[in-house]
């Protein structure tokens, strides 16, 4: 996941200045020998970028599609509704500003929302952490990001039938459907 995020940062920088990750689809099946980016959609307030990694034989080894949006309102100003948590607690983690800074330095994700005193945890940083935490060498995920997670927030991951749900307190922040 981290090498896909690193390659994603090679995309045109205008897609990273204040834009937020609304969703992602990741397929990781084997190591990749070569990686390439492709902008599939570039509109005023939304963009889709694909990162594909080819295996030595030329087949698709891994792929990441990200759905980026430029919010109309400042992040964190829209009230979020608490909800009943479903599923069994799988794992939890509190991201530090140093972890976010390390991720940004490694991937090259220079988005301003991941910097400052109270940065937002990058969505792909959380996905990469979860992949490592679950010791997954292969995966097929569709991730929908619902609300931001900030440095210092305790992120709790719950497993339900066919999906993982992430919460900060009783606020659902993202859902991963296992494809």
Residue positions per predicted region:
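A contiguous, surface-exposed recognition patch within enzymatic or periplasmic domains that forms
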Residues: 85-119
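Short linear sequence motifs
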Residues: 96-99, 138, 160
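Generic alpha-helix signal with a bias toward terminal, lower-confidence helices
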Residues: 73, 107, 115, 132, ...
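Active-site helix/loop of acyl-thioester processing domains in fatty-acid/polyketide metabolism
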Residues: 1-32, 110-112, 119-138
